[in-house]
UniProtKB/Swiss-Prot annotation:
HAMAP family: DNA_mis_repair (MF_00149). This protein is involved in the repair of mismatches in DNA. It is required for dam-dependent methyl-directed DNA mismatch repair. May act as a 'molecular matchmaker', a protein that promotes the formation of a stable complex between two or more DNA-binding proteins in an ATP-dependent manner without itself being part of a final effector complex. Belongs to the DNA mismatch repair MutL/HexB family. PANTHER family: DNA MISMATCH REPAIR PROTEIN MLH, PMS, MUTL, DNA MISMATCH REPAIR PROTEIN MLH1. Keywords: DNA damage, DNA repair. This is DNA mismatch repair protein MutL. GO terms for molecular function: ATP binding; ATP hydrolysis activity; ATP-dependent DNA damage sensor activity; mismatched DNA binding. The gene is mutL. Pfam families: DNA_mis_repair, HATPase_c_3, MutL_C. It comes from the Bacteria. One of its GO terms (biological process) is mismatch repair. GO terms for cellular component: mismatch repair complex. It comes from Coxiella burnetii (strain Dugway 5J108-111).
Amino acid sequence: MYIRRLNDQTANQIAAGEVVERPASVVKELIENSIDAHASCIRVDILQGGAKQIRIQDDGDGIHPEDLVLALERHATSKIAKIDDLQDITTLGFRGEALASISAVSRLTLTSRQKNAEMGYRISNISHKIMTPVPAAHPQGTTIDVQDLFYNTPARRKFLRSPATEFQHIRRIIERLALSHFTTEFLLHHNEKEIIHFKSATTISGQENRIKSILGDVFMQSALAIEFSQSGLTLKGYIAEAAYTRSQPDLQYIYVNGRFVRDKLIAQALRQAYHDVLFHGRHPAYVLYLEIDPAFVDINVHPTKHEVRFRDPQWVRDFLIHAVKTALAQAKPGIAHPLPQSTAEYNPITNFAPTPLIEGQGNLSLIQEQPAPYTQTIVHKHPLGHALAQLQGIYILSQNEKGLVIVDMHAAHERILYEKMKKQLAEVGLAMQSLLVPINLSLNPQEITAWQTNKALFARLGFEIESFGPDKIVVRRHPSLLKPKNLENLIRDVLADLITHNTTSRVGERINAALATLACHAALRAPHYLTIEEMEALLREMEKTEHGGLCNHGRPTWKQFDIAELDTFFLRGQ
């Protein structure tokens, strides 16, 4: 078989397969062009889920008549001129493929007029032939009419889903773009019916209203605002408190320099930040905006531009984990901001404190101090209020300014102990335990290189490992919190992480899991009856404990019942 050059029509249709997957792909590419053209208002009209017609009109800069023909050709763009421009790209589009790819699989008409121009011009691509531009009445901006998508590629058209399904994909695309371009007005019509109208949002409240309309009221009610900058990176946006989770990762929006991305490194970093507070099988919700010097991120990874590649992935990962963990730590029980560290005005009588994490010492205990006279203080000074009684040695009943608070004693004490153990571990360090029989491991060349490069890391993680020949290592000591069983697999998994990602969190996760187990077993168990003073001390500890609203397994530690809620239940005032 001889090698032959593909004709332009075939080449364009193959290229279109990478850019135009479905009607939503067309909408994404065309709206991004409108945004790059500084449009303040973008209207999208859809017929039959986009298979029949997609019409996008904007009030942007418009296209010069002499550029109309070039606009429909492949690799023609106004965004970049040379390869070096990719190092500082700030526009959403830059590849010069969108219009050519769309016109290769549809009947496309483009009409545009620049500011101060006497008239607009229209150009069409019919049967793969670009027609000569002709004058046409048109307001400032550009209108692109795409009809009969995939009419010339029946196999692609067969794979389209129902109009309702395709329209939902289009809607999600517009919502994603609306979440990163608040000053732009967006209108979406389907079958001549208005579905979405996002007005320009120039204030914080306006932006929050747009987020609420997309992610929902419940998200905004539980959202924590975040703004964190460090070493040239900035993270802004909103993250949901750990108590608000989803069964699916459907409310996760991450933007890099204003561009929506799906990035495994970012997703894993954010999940790691929620690790201590996320219930098994649940997913966090967030809308976050990462700002980074364009020179440190490559967006030219895939034609859809959903994937990015960072020059220093570890730098970005560590920053994201630290930023989100810091924000989550501010969500103390009953409040949406950090409490003062001092609670001297109450002087709790019971100290819930762990014993040092060193070898040979036992579990945690309640250390009873000399009781102080209990006096009722003003309720609103403490978000969790003041203890009233205990129910069956399980739940603490408390009264605060809003009404009744019910606290799960075991879950609350478990979180308090866990956070104190983690803090003490960071201060005292890991205790190590010698293996009765050292473990010999044979490593491949990549694993040997990873081990030699990261010897200091293994030492910090609590391992004593030595070289044992050119391709072997011997493990002599390990963190005492980890059981010797499966240590070989753990070390190999860590080396695999270091080879693939140049970082690992496996050992830290195992150690935290061990601490969580210790805290769970050491915490007060039902039925256990406390005095009022002991209940008060537990409430005060909860208020100053990070993630005090959730136990180590992600379950809630307390529940608020407002007076109004109780009045409604008992039909008071009706």
